Structure formats: C-alpha cells, structure tokens
Amino acid sequence: MNATIFAFLLLLNLAMHNATEQSSETDMDDTLLIPEINRGRCIEEGKWCPKKAPCCGRLECKGPSPKQKKCTRP
C-alpha cells in the first residue's frame, strides 16, 4: 500500500511539473513584471499619458495627437 501511494505521488509530481513548464513558456515581450505595473509613479496600459509621468515598463506613449496619447505596447 505504501508503494502505491508513493507511485501515485510521484506521478502527481511529474504531472504538476510538466504543467508548470508549459505555462511558463510565455513571451517576455507580452508580459509585464508586477513591480513595473504597480510602481505608482508610472502610467499603466490604456491610460492617458501626460508629460509628467512615464508609462510603465516597456509601454510607449502613442497617439494621433499630443492630447490623445495613451500608454500602449510597442
């Protein structure tokens, strides 16, 4: 019985390890790190970006005119 439980736990561990490897295969250009988002001094994606505060992380301030600029991904 102990061997059965051990085998079950081993298979469960392997399954969880494979699931975490697959979920961590994201492109770093498409993700922002949490400290970059919640810095407080920067503007998040989709928000209006005045000259006073920069956009967070790799976001850029883009728009058709200076008054209509928003923080967007490059």
Curated annotation (Swiss-Prot):
Ribonucleoprotein in keyword set: no
Domain notes: The presence of a 'disulfide through disulfide knot' structurally defines this protein as a knottin.
Residue stretch(es) of the prosequence: 20-39
Localization annotation: Secreted
Protein's job: Probable ion channel inhibitor.
Main location, first listed in the record: secreted
UniProt similarity note: Belongs to the neurotoxin 36 family. 01 subfamily.
GO molecular-function term, one example from the UniProt record: ion channel regulator activity
Disulfide bonds: 42-56, 49-61, 55-71
Recorded superkingdom: Eukaryota
Protein name: U4-theraphotoxin-Cg1a
GO terms for cellular component: extracellular region
Signal peptide: 1-19
